[in-house]
Swiss-Prot record:
Residues 119-144 form a coiled coil. The lineage of its organism: Bacteria, Pseudomonadati, Pseudomonadota, Gammaproteobacteria, Enterobacterales. GO terms for cellular component: bacterial nucleoid; cytoplasm. Residues 10-70 form the HTH tetR-type domain. The gene is slmA. PROSITE patterns: HTH_TETR_1, HTH_TETR_2. Required for nucleoid occlusion (NO) phenomenon, which prevents Z-ring formation and cell division over the nucleoid. Acts as a DNA-associated cell division inhibitor that binds simultaneously chromosomal DNA and FtsZ, and disrupts the assembly of FtsZ polymers. SlmA-DNA-binding sequences (SBS) are dispersed on non-Ter regions of the chromosome, preventing FtsZ polymerization at these regions. This is Nucleoid occlusion factor SlmA.
């Protein structure tokens, strides 16, 4: 019984990895059908539906992976790092690095892969970015407690500006067909971004 469960879990992971790879390829800029996905995995469409009731559920699973990866690591950054600017830098670098290492999933983060899918999926990505923005804002608000001095500009404005930088770099990565990596020249870009944090 345990072997059967493991085989089923492995097949599910194989399906999700194939979907992510298809999103990374030139197919990712077009609608991915279950027929194409089944062919990529080497199974029938019926076999896909034994593991996932719908393609939407496959995207849900990929979004869950994105959420878990980013939120878990953000929490680790907040636990380990106490300096506000360093925290913000590490969170931005985390988002950009995650996108760079997972090009197919970046198409989901930017919404490109979800254009032909249910609106609910885009809503989940919107909620993820809202959670990250709230976290950035909280980090900024804690600066006054931790360091004795807050920002002169509104934290809501600063957090949205920081997140817009991340979204812009991820969008550029997708638009360039993954040529312009989000972390390219990060060490030169970060001082420009950090200078806005006043």
């Amino acid at each position: 019984m345990a072997e059967k469960q493991t085989a089923k879990r492995n097949r599910r992971e194989e399906i999700l990895q194939s979907l992510a790879l298809m999103l990374e390829s030139s197919d990712g800029s077009q609608r991915i059908t279950t027929a194409k996905l089944a062919a990529s995995v080497g199974v029938s469409e019926a076999a896909l539906y034994r593991h996932f009731p719908s393609k939407t559920r496959m995207f849900d699973s990929l979004i869950e992976f994105i959420e878990d990866s980013l939120i878990t690591r953000i929490n680790l950054i907040l636990k380990d790092e106490k300096d506000t600017t360093a925290r913000l830098r590490l969170i931005v670098l985390l988002i950009l690095g995650f996108g760079e290492r997972n090009p197919g999933l970046t198409r989901i983060l930017t919404g490109h892969a979800l254009m032909f899918e249910q609106d609910r999926l885009q809503g989940r990505i919107n909620q993820l970015f809202e959670r990250i923005e709230v976290q950035l804002r909280q980090v900024m608000r804690e600066k006054k407690m931790r360091e004795g001095e807050g920002y002169t500009l509104d934290e809501t404005l600063l957090a949205s500006q920081l997140l817009a930088f991340c979204e812009g770099m991820l969008s550029r990565f997708v638009r360039s067909e993954f040529k312009y990596r989000p972390t390219d020249d990060f060490e030169a870009r970060w001082p420009l971004v950090a200078a806005q944090l006043q």
